[in-house]
Design a protein with these regions (language model features):
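Basic, helix-initiating cap at the start of DNA-binding domains
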Residues: 1-34, 39
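C-terminal peripheral helix-coil segments that are non-catalytic and often amphipathic
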Residues: 1-4, 133-137, 147, 163-197
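Helix-turn-helix
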Residues: 28-60
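Amphipathic alpha-helical packing segments from all-alpha helical-bundle domains
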Residues: 92, 115-140, 144-151, 155-158
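Short, hydrophobic secondary-structure boundary micro-motifs
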Residues: 109-111, 173
Length: 197
């Protein structure tokens, strides 16, 4: 009589290892320490080979983290649009966006500010634009392509954030958020009674 094999649960170890690596990046960034693979591995309590088994390099790690963050921000945006004004929604989402870049500033400055690779920057922009597309499909005026609008918002926002990350005298996060809000298209943040403030 044939036996039916019970499907195995996914191995939880890679998820735990990835979580330890992400947490290590956050701790290193909070202390202002250099974020390198050896530093991350030591902080996470894993070997360098274990790091590389999970992430190709620091760029891949940053792209993975930001892709998840952009997904969370888009979900927040779409849920708030049902009950909040456009400017309230934009304030909440830009606050979350800037807070993420501040939390892992050292990693993102190294990846997005690198003059040696633009692959990570393109991947981050593409992930941002992909997640912004849902909002753009709901908000763009007639005649505008939502995909183009999503690329525009993602590219412009990342330009502001990258300049802030690389600044020798960075502005407070509240100022960065205000700059982002002021640069967003009016049709995205205003209704009949709101103005960006």
């Amino acid at each position: 009589m044939p036996t039916t094999a019970t499907p195995r649960s996914p191995d939880p170890r890679p998820a735990r290892t990835q979580a330890a690596i992400v947490a290590a990046v956050e701790r290193l960034s909070a202390r202002g320490d250099e974020v390198t693979v050896p530093a991350i591995a030591a902080e996470a309590g894993v070997s360098r080979s274990t790091f590389y088994a999970q992430f190709r390099d620091l760029d891949a790690l940053a792209v993975r983290i930001l892709t998840e963050v952009f997904t969370e921000i888009e979900a927040l945006d779409l849920s708030l649009r049902a009950s909040a004004t456009p400017i309230e929604t934009a304030r909440a989402t830009t606050s979350q966006l800037v807070a993420e870049f501040a939390k892992r500033r050292t990693l993102y400055a190294g990846v997005l500010g690198s003059r040696t690779t633009t692959e990570a920057h393109r991947a981050v922009r593409a992930a941002f634009a992909e997640q912004a597309l849902g909002t753009m499909q709901l908000t763009v005026p007639a005649g505008l392509d939502p995909k183009v609008a999503a690329e525009y918002v993602a590219g412009g926002s990342l330009a502001v954030i990258t300049a802030w990350l690389l600044s020798d005298a960075p502005e407070p996060i509240e100022r960065v958020q205000q700059q982002l809000l002021s640069l967003l298209p009016a049709w995205l943040i205003n209704d009949d009674t709101d103005t960006p403030s």
